[in-house]
UniProtKB/Swiss-Prot annotation:
WD repeats (start-end): 113-154, 156-196, 200-243, 246-285, 290-350, 352-391, 396-448
UniProt keyword terms in alphabetical order: Cell cycle, Cell division, Coiled coil, Cytoplasm, Cytoskeleton, Microtubule, Mitosis, Repeat, Transport, WD repeat
Cell compartments where the protein resides: Cytoplasm, Cytoskeleton; Cytoplasm, Cytoskeleton, Spindle pole
GO biological process: cell division; establishment of mitotic spindle orientation; microtubule sliding
PROSITE patterns on file: LISH (PS50896), WD_REPEATS_1 (PS00678), WD_REPEATS_2 (PS50082), WD_REPEATS_REGION (PS50294)
Top-level taxon of origin: Eukaryota
Protein name in UniProt: Nuclear distribution protein PAC1-2
Statement: the UniProt record of this protein carries the keyword Cell division: yes
Matches recorded under Pfam families: LisH_PAC1, WD40
Organism field: Chaetomium globosum (strain ATCC 6205 / CBS 148.51 / DSM 1962 / NBRC 6347 / NRRL 1970) (Soil fungus)
SUPFAM superfamilies xrefs: Lissencephaly-1 protein (Lis-1, PAF-AH alpha) N-terminal domain, WD40 repeat-like
Amino acid sequence: MNPVLTSRQADELHKSIVAYLTANNLSTTAATLREELSLGEDVFDAEKTAKYQSLLEKKWTSVVRLQKKVMDLESRSVALQSELEHSTPASLSKRKDPTSWLPRSPPRHSLESHQAIVNCLAFHPVFSSLASGSDDSTVKIWDWELGELERTLKGHTRAVLDIDFGGPRGAILLASCSSDSTIKLWDPADEYKNTRTLTGHDHSVSAVRFVTSRPRSENLLVSASGDKTLKVWDITAGYCIKTLQGHTGWVRDVVPSLDGRFLLSSGTDQTARLWDISAADPESKLVMVGHENGIRCCAFAPPASYVHMAALAGLKKPPPSTSTAEFMATGSRDKTIKLWNSTGTCIKTLVGHDNWVSGLVFHPGGKYLLSVADDKTLRCWDLGDDGRCVKVLADAHGQFITCLRWAPGIVKKGADQGAEDTGPLEKTAPSEVQIRCLVATTSVDKVVRIFAD
């Protein structure tokens, strides 16, 4: 057998083993090895032995670290190879096309200041501000372009679980919800002063979203809670105007449709529910069943995705772009993502994550769905290619990823000139909104990451 080590390397290894055995009180074994290797006290005394005591352990741990690094690099190489294989001259030439842009490593910024898990984030619809909420009970406001912390908001007494910017144009507010069972409203125009605190839930409030005004005079907010209910609030009056009951477990997430008529909720009861809040006494219009564990997140498909979702559903033509709540997506602790149609039928199950799915967002261009999970990855699924996973950011975070958001689009100049509507962005036609190539994630590693073109 040809020796792998040189004579000097072998001598170093032998001395390291003897020193390790001696340091761990295995004197009999050490003495036997000394005798077989001719390393008696006259050659390898106590002083020299002490110099080698920790060498074997250091070598061992360095090998483990190198192995992990090699595995990470191999995973990254596979992801890059996959991206390269599926790139064509046409797709490469469209890299600057926002409808085909996907986030890639490294992130533009890694924002660090929170002292505990970061649970949520939200982009300001107009300015380069981003808000994040954490288990440290604070909300932090950042300038995502500069990567700098602007201010820290204190008021909640327990973990901040979700946040959202919204309200009519010119009067945008920030809403936050917490394990302290409250929702707080903050005014960005007045140095983020806490203007109102909404109480009424009997458990942690896990999700909060502004709803497009219906009619224009109203300012609505919806919340989801561990008390198994959803609540709709009039933020001007500060009152709960509707309580929606139907879930039999903790309601983990809720999102409004673009027109504000429908809500999509999901929870630990393994169901997703569609609600029509325009009804005087709303009940769940649809119950989606199919996941094998709790559903952590949900999302409405934008009209831009209808052509791809319709193909997945086997439809000859897509629904009209003016309709809402035609297709939906849910992410679960069963590690899968399910796509649903308006009848509550699962049209596709996306498999690839190795742990709980914690966040979903549809690409504004409509062709892709992005997801994050406790497997520390961000994945991109091509809805126009049978939902195939076409990109994986394996190094998105060092620990579980808790949230994923895509920055809202910017209304093109002149798109709403002369219009009386001063409502939120969702009321603007998709063709009049410029896509921003800007995505952010949060994690158990206490970091907010910005992925931008």
